[in-house]
């Protein structure tokens, strides 16, 4: 078992920034060089970004580099670059490419209530990641999935906090109440990000923030980037609420299945505790999100209904892409990571 270091999620070294990941194409290379103060400093323009796949490795690592400046930053990168106008211009081009593809490829249900109801319907085929882990997952599958999700789970609730100053009344009060739970109800040892770090340590993974970004493919980065994209733009507050509703609604059944997998594989109490917590807490949150957060927002700003529906559709679209990528690799007996985990049982 890995000992939980003091820089994992909380503790004296918690603010230590991660290392810059390696580039995955010309666009991310240009941004990486800018962050390091190397090279010509020339950043990609519309023509270069138009050549990127909107869901590909290069674009989503580039977006990840931009967004992480608003969280922990990177080792060796000046904090002043968070608001560097040239980086912000490049980020806007990347976001436009990403958003345009999502709005083309996603088909939101016209009624938000119908969209929320659809989230409660479990797929009959049971082919998702949590189904795989529950029915036939091995320890190495659990480790890979924990490493993948750590890219955003070690800051679990942070992106959704950006919506709080943009909400009013019922929606704001309910959102803060739910986030209070996410942050441990005032107890740092109960913060969900801390519980996730303890889960990682129990699975013999390094729980340092950003440790497994190199191993995460474009599908995971796109799902992670989506919440930052929604969170950083006030015009997308409805979409961020839709994103939040998906996570809180779909979490309990998936967490229940993964909790069963942790018990079957003997992952240990810390691994079980994280998923058990989400079975209990998110079951309560689901109704609060629907009635008060979504309901309150649409009472105050009914014109945002299409954006809430878009947020739901975009989140499901990217999560489905991620799930298919992971399960397809595992079904072939292969790793779902870009780089293998050290000390992992060989697939």
Stretch-by-stretch model annotation:
Residues 2-347:
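Non-heme di-metal
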